[in-house]
Regions:
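Active-site loop/oxyanion-hole signature of alpha/beta-hydrolase fold enzymes
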Residues: 14-15, 22, 60-103
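Conserved HGGG/HGGXW glycine-rich cap/lid loop of the alpha/beta-hydrolase fold
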Residues: 22-71, 90
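Conserved hydrolase catalytic core segment
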Residues: 97-126
Length: 126
């Protein structure tokens, strides 16, 4: 059985950035957060959302600068510290204290920074 994917969610974070995300599964189940690479967007995780949404609240955001998320024009708005902050704030926005974080490529750099800087937010890093 595959979970239904719900697109078109938006999270306005405390830092002012608005992120688009897709999700599958039910809130309340463990959060499985997928971070895409460059130059991708949430759809890179389509199959994983369908599969893992049966057991988790699976979420795949469009990272800052990609697809339907905010696309700041200043290069300085893409510093690793700010990209990491987006992930940290998204976890809280979704109502979770931690998550299983799955990432690759560009998203992997942010995932590592979250795990190192805020280890209490990451139950597992994949």
């Amino acid at each position: 059985m595959k979970a239904t994917i719900h697109e078109g969610h938006f999270a306005t974070l405390p830092n002012g950035i608005r992120l688009h995300y897709a999700s599958a599964g039910e809130r309340g189940k463990p959060l499985l957060l997928f971070l895409h690479g460059f130059p991708e967007f949430w759809y890179a995780w389509y199959e994983q959302l369908q599969t893992f949404g049966t057991s988790y609240f699976a979420v795949a955001p469009d990272l800052r600068g990609f697809n339907l998320s905010d696309q700041p024009t200043n290069v300085s708005d893409y510093k690793p510290k700010l990209l990491t902050q987006d992930v940290e704030q998204l976890i809280a926005h979704l109502g979770y204290e931690n998550c299983i974080l799955v990432a690759h490529d560009w998203g992997g750099a942010s995932a590592w920074n979250v795990a190192i800087g805020q280890p209490q937010l990451v139950e597992r890093l994949i």
